Design a protein with these regions (language model features):
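Sec-dependent N-terminal signal peptides
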Residues: 4-13
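Short helix-capping/linker turns of helical repeat alpha-solenoids
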Residues: 20, 32-33, 51-53, 66-68, ...
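Alpha-helical segment of the N-proximal tetratricopeptide repeat
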Residues: 21-40, 44-47, 51
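Terminal, low-structured helical/coil segments at or just beyond the last alpha-helical repeat
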Residues: 22, 121-155
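Hydrophobic face of amphipathic alpha-helices that form TPR/SEL1-like repeat modules
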Residues: 24-32, 59-66, 95-102, 136-137, ...
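TPR/TPR-like (Sel1-like) alpha-helical repeat modules
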Residues: 94, 98, 108-128
């Protein structure tokens, strides 16, 4: 019985340390990314993303989406956004909607785009910010208008 308890405790400690190191890797990668040191940021973000860190998956997806520090790869960006979005990260849901709307890294599918945009906007933390940004951008670009029309928020 004591062995089982110690084994459980060891596993819990191991998972906690792994999560902490993923957070540290992400924070270092984000710091480098914000300094526009993309090539240095990518390995840190990749390591954190491999550990399941949703923000690292999103940020690494942005790197592949824009070609920051890596060769642009729409399919890889889509896959990373999807992993992050499945962990309920609104920013990734929004980017996933854009991928489906434009057919970037995946076949264009307006219904899937609409679904992901709505999920992003309904997110308690980030949804209002996304909606405000879209409405502000509407005056400057047709993409924002297209997204707002697609989700029925074009008022």
């Amino acid at each position: 019985m004591t062995r089982l308890f110690l084994l459980s405790l060891l596993m819990l400690f191991s998972m906690t340390m792994s999560a902490q190191s993923a957070d540290k890797l992400y924070e270092e990668g984000k710091r480098l990314y914000d300094l526009e040191q993309y090539k240095e940021a990518v390995p840190k973000l990749q390591a954190a993303a491999d550990k399941g860190h949703y923000k690292a998956q999103y940020r690494l997806g942005r790197c592949y989406d824009k070609g920051d520090g890596v060769k642009e790869n729409d399919q890889k960006a889509f896959e990373l956004y999807l992993k992050s979005a499945k962990q309920d990260y609104a920013k990734a849901m929004y980017q996933l909607g854009r991928c489906y709307m434009k057919g970037k890294g995946v076949a264009a599918n307006q219904e899937e785009a609409k679904k992901w945009f709505k999920r992003a906007i309904n997110d308690i933390k980030h949804g209002d910010d996304i909606l405000k940004d879209l409405r502000k951008a509407k005056a400057d670009g047709e993409e924002a208008t297209r997204i707002l029309t697609l989700i029925g928020k074009n008022k």
